Amino acid sequence: MKILGLDSSAKTASAAITDGEQLISEAFVNAGLTHSETLLPMVDSVLSLARLTMADIDGCVITDGPGSFTGIRIGIAAVKGLAMPNETKCCGVSTLKAMAYNLRYDNCIACCAMDARCSQVYSAIFRCFDGKVERLTEDDAIPASKLPEILEKYANERIICVGDGAHIAYQAVKDSFKSVSLAQDSRHFQRAYGAACAAVCENMDFIPPAQLLPVYLRPSQAERELSLKKSHNQ
């Protein structure tokens, strides 16, 4: 199964072509939130390197959140535009789960964290072993200070913090656990390849592109400010 994977849910962006779990081609950019300029050229690049066109793609995979509201919208809009002409089925994968797949051969507890600002992180905990990833907690937006409590039951296991919020998570938990570390730089960020692997390894459902929806976990800053303004006016 030829898959086009995409990620633009945070600071980095990536695109990948896989044949099942096997990586064929990949592009990765860490240049800030310029995804509207970089994502489609990366798709063209990975397709060209793989000597494929969108007509050859059996399924598209996109990280559907949590993360940057703008980045998520750009990614979902891009994958819909790419998939609709050929009615290619699509699959949305948690950004945090895609991160965990970076560590699937590490035999560890993956503390996946993204900087959600306001002293919070988007986080989920996974157990990685023998190439498999087992979800232990649901994706959530939480204060980083809650992580030691969440991870307490895994205190005797090796814990690796991964994601663009990994340093925040690490600072929150390093004094509570003996065996906690940061992921290597090369595996620090979510990748389109990880999202594609998750979809394949877990036999996720592929749906019509029009049915793809973003997963934000919390209202946007503008929505929160509007809600606060309304409450003050009541």
Predicted regions and their residues:
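Stable alpha-helical structural segments in soluble proteins, enriched in small hydrophobic residues
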Residues: V46-A50, P85, L103, A192-D205
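N-terminal beta-alpha supersecondary unit
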Residues: M1-P66, A141
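Surface "functional belts" at beta-alpha junctions
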Residues: Q22, K89-F189, Y216, Q221, ...
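Phosphate-handling active-site elements
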Residues: S48-A55, A83-V93, F206-I207
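Acyltransferase
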Residues: A183-Q234
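DPxDG-like acidic metal-binding loop motif
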Residues: V61-C90, T95
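Residues at secondary-structure transition points
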Residues: N30-T38, F69-R73, A77, S94, ...
